[in-house]
């Protein structure tokens, strides 16, 4: 608190009416305060009546209004009067010898926390809280901002600004204000709980689900309403991430303890109930900064920086594609795809006829040949060209879509698709949806749901299915609607042995490692053996051993395991110090000792 906030009036100030002072002293004793070494048990009813009468007699005395608020009358009218008469704050308190801070009241900030007001800056915050509750956001924010300019480190003022921005749904400003203080060790348990919950909710409302979960993972705490809000936000964040089972579990636990909460009940009954997200750019685009209703929708919003970002995405996609080793035909097909989409958009802009083409894709090839990475490249191309709003790729498998009971599969599939809208849905090992062959397989329900959404959300969803060519052909034959929607296909060949060696060398270079010449030769022999050998997969289908190993995925595992072998070898040598070259070099022995356990773990033969 500022030491001069209740300073004595200048010399020569008019004396206060003694009857007013006497009545004030009596009222303060009714609050239980010590006045002139006399104290009596608090009687708030008497205090409230006494201070109410005193405010009629001395309506220009701030201390009378402070006393009325201290007695429990923290109404908008009383808070307004405290602020209106703030210039006289402390006059009556000094007359009866009250110590600074003894007389005060507690006000609600409007979001989890309550603060005590005993001095003019406190009263200014209390008045600001009253203003924003009445919808006067601009004036309230100005009052708080004036205090923060003088006292930038004062948490009470910062929190009031947080509460104002929360009420106006300015989530990016809440994040900006709370991020610097969330880890402060000076926060008590109550304040820390409020800050963590508020920050988690605000991040979630901005669609930043991963960082939001770092604050919402354990929503429990001393503030009951914050614990409920945090748990609900956690559940809806999990739902937005496609983790429906976990979300339902949180909601069920929450409903068990708070069955009166209608939002929790609605979220349980309706799986489409979720977070309404926005962006900081859309918030800043409001015609009235404090009115969420003036914020442009996602469809209406024109981002002034979008053109530059789209150009950057196209450059990123081109650079990532160029980095790939091998895959020349894949690169060519992706380049053709980009040209096809780009020219279709240009023709449409000029009013020329554009043939109806599907943008959904089939990626056919064995594991580890870059299908997922190329899917991300395609997403950036589609977004950079304006076909999609996001470059996100939602990768899913059968287990993410299939439920155990009637109705569950449709709900799970719809939730996954909702999370992928405006981006790419990447369905890996798509044939697994129908691989059981059973007529009552819920995978067929997932396919029907997917087809319906591909039609209904055709402008907001691109689907890429991936897997082995024969498996994908069988998948596309399970429903007549699939073939017509997946007319574009890119084949991903297995890598050659020299390409895999080059991949290993490049991976090692990025990790400050280098293979000796003998290790190069050993890897090429190993990869050649795997490319020539065949092994039955889990379904009994003969596959190249290299495809079962996972192509580039196996290479990554081999590089990482070889580095571990190098570290172990050096650590158990008689040397006490090593050169940089020794610490970087992976030997043939390191590779050999790494390859054998990796192959055995995959059920593959170890070459002699």
Curated annotation (Swiss-Prot):
SMART domains associated with the record: AAA
Residues reported to bind ATP: 365-372
Acidic residues bias: start-end ranges: 290-301
UniProt-annotated stretches for the region Disordered: 284-303
Localization per record: Cytoplasm
CDD domains in alphabetical order: AAA
Keyword Nucleotide-binding annotated: yes
Keywords: ATP-binding, Cytoplasm, Nucleotide-binding
Record GO terms (molecular function): ATP binding; ATP hydrolysis activity
Segments forming a coiled coil: none
Gene3D superfamilies, A to Z: 1.10.8.60, P-loop containing nucleotide triphosphate hydrolases (3.40.50.300), Tetratricopeptide repeat domain (1.25.40.10)
Free-text function comment from the UniProt entry: Part of the ESX-3 specialized secretion system, which is required for siderophore-mediated iron acquisition and for the secretion of EsxH and EsxG. EccA3 exhibits ATPase activity and may provide energy for the export of ESX-3 substrates.
Subunit structure: Part of the ESX-3 / type VII secretion system (T7SS), which is composed of cytosolic and membrane components.
Name this polypeptide is given: ESX-3 secretion system protein EccA3
């Amino acid at each position: 608190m500022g030491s001069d906030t209740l300073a004595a009036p200048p010399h020569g100030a008019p004396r206060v009416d003694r009857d007013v002072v006497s009545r004030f002293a009596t009222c303060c004793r009714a609050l239980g305060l010590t006045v002139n070494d006399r104290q009596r048990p608090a009687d708030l009813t008497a205090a409230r009546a006494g201070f109410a009468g005193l405010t009629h007699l001395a309506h220009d005395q701030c201390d009378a209004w402070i006393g009325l608020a201290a007695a429990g009358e923290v109404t908008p009218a009383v808070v307004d009067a405290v602020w209106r008469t703030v210039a006289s704050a402390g006059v009556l308190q000094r007359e009866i010898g009250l110590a600074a801070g003894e007389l005060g009241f507690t006000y609600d900030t409007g979001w989890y926390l309550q603060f005590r007001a005993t001095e003019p800056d406190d009263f200014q915050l209390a008045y600001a809280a009253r203003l924003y509750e009445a919808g006067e956001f601009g004036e309230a924010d100005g009052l708080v901002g004036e205090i923060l300019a003088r006292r930038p480190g004062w948490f009470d003022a910062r929190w009031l600004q947080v509460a104002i921005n929360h009420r106006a749904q300015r989530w990016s400003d809440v994040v900006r204000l709370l991020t610097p203080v969330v880890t402060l060790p000076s926060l008590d348990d109550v304040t820390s709980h409020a800050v963590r919950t508020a920050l988690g909710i605000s991040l979630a409302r901005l669609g930043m689900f991963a960082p939001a979960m770092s604050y919402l993972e354990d929503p429990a705490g001393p503030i009951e309403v914050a614990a409920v809000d945090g748990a609900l936000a956690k559940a809806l964040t999990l739902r937005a991430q496609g983790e429906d089972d976990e979300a339902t579990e949180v909601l069920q636990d929450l409903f068990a303890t708070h069955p009166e909460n209608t939002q929790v009940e609605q979220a349980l009954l309706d799986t489409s109930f979720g977070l309404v997200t926005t962006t900081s750019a859309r918030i800043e685009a409001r015609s009235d900064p404090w009115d969420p209703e003036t914020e442009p929708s996602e469809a209406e919003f024109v981002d002034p920086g979008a053109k530059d970002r789209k150009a950057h995405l196209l450059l990123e996609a081109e650079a990532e594609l160029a980095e790939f080793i091998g895959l020349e035909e894949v690169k060519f097909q992706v380049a053709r795809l980009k040209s096809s989409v780009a020219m279709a958009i240009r023709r449409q802009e000029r009013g020329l006829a554009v043939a109806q083409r599907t943008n959904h894709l089939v990626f056919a090839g064995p594991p580890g040949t870059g299908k997922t990475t190329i899917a991300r490249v395609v997403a950036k191309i589609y977004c950079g060209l304006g076909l999609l709003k996001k470059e996100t790729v939602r990768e899913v498998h059968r287990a993410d879509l299939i439920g155990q009971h009637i109705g569950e599969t449709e709900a799970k599939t719809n939730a996954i698709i909702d999370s992928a809208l405006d981006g790419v849905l990447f369905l890996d090992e798509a044939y697994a949806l129908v691989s059981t062959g059973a007529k009552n397989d819920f995978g067929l329900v997932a396919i029907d749901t997917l087809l319906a959404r591909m039609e209904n959300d055709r402008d907001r969803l691109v689907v890429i299915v991936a897997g082995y060519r024969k498996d994908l052909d069988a998948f596309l034959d399970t429903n007549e609607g699939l073939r017509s929607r997946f007319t574009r296909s890119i084949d991903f060949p297995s890598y050659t042995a020299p390409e895999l060696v080059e991949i290993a060398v490049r991976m090692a270079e990025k990790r400050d490692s280098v293979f000796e010449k003998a290790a190069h030769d050993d890897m090429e022999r190993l990869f050649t053996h795997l490319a020539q050998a065949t092994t039955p997969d889990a379904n009994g289908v003969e596959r190249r051993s290299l495809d079962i190993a996972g192509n580039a995925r196996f290479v990554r595992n081999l590089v990482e395991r070889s580095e571990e072998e190098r570290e172990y070898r050096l650590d158990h040598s008689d040397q006490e110090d090593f050169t940089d070259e020794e610490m970087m070099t992976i030997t043939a022995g390191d590779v050999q000792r790494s390859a054998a356990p990796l192959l055995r773990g995959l059920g593959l033969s170890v070459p002699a």
